[in-house]
UniProtKB/Swiss-Prot annotation:
This is RNA-binding protein NOB1. It is found in: Nucleus. The modification Phosphoserine is found at S184, S201, S325, S352. The keyword Zinc applies. It comes from Homo sapiens. The lineage of its organism: Eukaryota, Metazoa, Chordata, Craniata, Vertebrata.
């Protein structure tokens, strides 16, 4: 594998311990990337790198260009200042050594495709290689294919229904009672032997991961190719950065040094106003403010095309259990109300002063009391409500009474 001439490394490259000396000839990064790494083992590896790490700051004009492009793609809220500088440095190196004539100034439109599977159904199973084997369509007596549904309107339910029971044994018993011809045991053994041989032929070498096909399987799972004639690339594991790079026309490298042709991830799409966001931590829509965000799988190809895969499964947008009565709003310092809007204000729920005090005998203003130990607060309002520092502004934990809850929980 020919190394890339210029590689811009993100923090994910150092955290994943990527062999950058084998991936690129010249390794670039910014000082903010090294500063934000807090892992002790990673910082220990950074002290003894087997290659020269070059620090270079991007020009303000490229930072401004990348910022405007990320706002158009919708990834700007998910990018930090360090991420934008890494993207700008990649764009700057591409402009210096290759040119900007092939780069895009506007993101392409989103293409929509539907699927009968659930959006969270795994596309690949880790540890198993399941190659696709095309099967010829079986013709029925009417001349129609048996694998195609007669009505496409109900095709989405075929994936979720339970398999039909096998009634061959009961039919054979009815034929024996009526005295009709039943196939002999020898014929059944011949048919079973033919099926066994067919199954054995399917199992030979199919579905197993071997040293001969491990490279092919890794490329299929990661949608990666060998980087050929690539002079500038960015090695990152962040999907928002990969999305911006691919839509701009820049090259994205994986941790193993392969060239990423397609990036797969999930985004949140509001089914009320149809706006999307890549910030998976959001609960309410940033455009309309409703709690109508749903997870949608997306793929970004190497030409910058963004595909959103919607599901025709009716269970994805099931309105069951969404209508329920809300409790009466309560006031006060320790009120716990349901979280209904994003800008809703909650009480601070702080601990009492007695619970927050600490004993420091070496403090200059320390006053010796009856006991040198900290008193345990058990009588204040916050202590009786079991308020902790981790629950600041958490609101009502279980908003929907129709939601499932754990049983057999140990009581305090």
């Amino acid at each position: 594998m020919a190394p890339v001439e210029h590689v811009v490394a993100d923090a994910g490259a150092f955290l994943r311990h990527a062999a950058l000396q084998d991936i690129g000839k010249n390794i670039y990064t910014i000082r903010e990337v090294v500063t934000e790494i807090r892992d002790k083992a990673t910082r220990r590896r950074l002290a003894v790198l087997p290659y020269e790490l070059r620090f270079k700051e991007p020009l303000p004009e490229y930072v401004r260009l990348v910022t405007e492009f990320s706002k158009k793609t919708g990834d700007y809220p998910s990018l930090s200042a360090t991420d934008i500088q890494v993207l700008a440095l990649t764009y700057q190196l591409e402009a210096e050594f290759v040119g900007v004539s092939h780069l895009k100034q506007e993101p392409q439109k989103v293409k929509v495709s539907s699927s009968i599977q659930h959006p969270e159904t795994p596309l690949h199973i880790s540890g198993f290689h399941l190659p696709y084997k095309p099967k010829p369509p079986q013709e029925t007596e009417k001349g129609h294919s048996a694998c195609e549904p007669e009505n496409l309107e109900f095709s989405s339910f075929m994936f979720w229904r339970n398999p039909l029971p096998n009634i061959d044994h009961e039919l054979q018993e009815l034929l024996i009672d009526r005295g009709e011809d039943v196939p002999s045991e020898e014929e059944e053994e011949e048919e079973n032997g033919f099926e066994d041989r067919k199954d054995d032929s399917d199992d030979d070498g199919g579905g197993w991961i071997t040293p001969s096909n491990i490279k092919q399987i890794q490329q299929e799972l990661e949608q990666c190719d060998v980087p050929e004639d690539v002079r500038v690339g960015c090695l990152t594991t962040d999907f928002a950065m990969q999305n911006v790079l691919l839509q701009m026309g820049l090259h994205v490298l994986a941790v193993n040094g392969m060239l990423i042709r397609e990036a797969r991830s999930y985004i949140l799409r509001c089914h009320g106003c149809f706006k999307t966001t890549s910030d998976m931590s959001r609960v309410f829509c940033s455009h309309c403010g409703n709690k109508t965000l749903k997870k949608v799988s997306v793929t970004v190809s190497d030409d910058g095309t963004l595909h959103m895969h919607f599901s025709r499964n009716p269970k994805v947008l099931n309105p069951r259990g969404l209508r329920y009565s809300l409790p009466t709003p309560k006031g006060g310092k320790y009120a716990i109300n349901p979280h209904l809007t994003e800008d809703q204000r909650f009480p601070q729920l702080r601990l009492s002063q007695k619970a927050r005090q600490k004993t420091n005998v070496f403090a200059p203003d320390y006053i010796a009391g009856v006991s040198p130990f900290v008193e345990n607060d058990i009588s204040s309002r916050s202590a009786t409500l079991q308020v902790r520092d981790s629950t600041l502004g958490a609101g009502r934990r279980r908003l929907n009474p129709n939601a499932s809850r754990k049983k057999f929980v140990k009581k305090r």
